[in-house]
Amino acid sequence: MTFRIGPHEIGTGRCFVVAEAGVNHNGNAGTALLLIRAAKDAGADAVKFQRRTPHAILTRAAYDRPYEGPNSYGATYGAHREALELSDAAWRSVMDTAAKIGIPCFASAWDEASADSLIALGVPAFKVASADLTNTPLIDHMARMGVPLIVSTGMSALAEVDDAYAVIRATGCDQFAFLHCVSTYPAEPAMVNLRVMETLRQRYPGVPIGYSGHETGLAVSIAAAALGAAIIERHLTLNRAAKGPDHAASLEPDGLRRLIRDIRNVEAALGDGRKLLLYSERPVRARLAKSLVVAHDRPAGHVLDVTDLVAKSPGSAIAPRYRS
């Protein structure tokens, strides 16, 4: 199973790198546009945001719950979440800017109204957040919209991933991927368990499997690429020290650029598995490898045998493996 997001085909071997801007714009349209440009400049294949309708996804008690702290943008949790949303006009500017500079832009839709508005804006894909993996009515709604789904599997059991898989397939959707994810911020390397990617590959044959990382640093995501992640998603911020819920577990633009550089180097290093004598190795082999030479002077007519031969550099003549 492969599918396309913009010019990129997912599931063909090249890792699709998503810069998750999320709500790291802090509700500011100008910051959102800067994040798009930062993602493009870093070499990301796509940039992703989040869209939610807070009053639709929170109970009244949850909406009105006092929410004070260093990362709060409102006196209540609902007000905080509202403050982190972009306006319709800002969303149009986001999509227009992404199209203009040539980077696919999509979003996590946290409710059906958000999904509908994103489709109207022309998103080329949806992300299903880990928080909605068990929200199968929402998954069903998005799977019927004719664009690919990228589904995160954080804070879930395997049986719940099975349920999401069944719901997606029942709609006829065959363009989707699962991302292994650990929903702690930040995730410690010992928690990450990257081998789950192979578990998911075996359980859902043909489905592209990737990794959504919330760890600090680059090593875990680079390891995911080495283990064959079809997609890698990392949060992007302009400043890790900024106020907001996700900045501390995000990469700044230079960190994202270095991550993408290293992922591409890993892909190049993995190669095709054929063992060959490389053209670039031949001068080194000629200089350092060994050839068969006669150990001592022998008279004319002497018939050489193996006791007369030793291996010495350079390696430009008969190899010692032909000694006998």
Describe the residue ranges of each PLM region.
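Catalytic cores and adjacent flexible loops of soluble metabolic enzymes
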Residues: 1-324
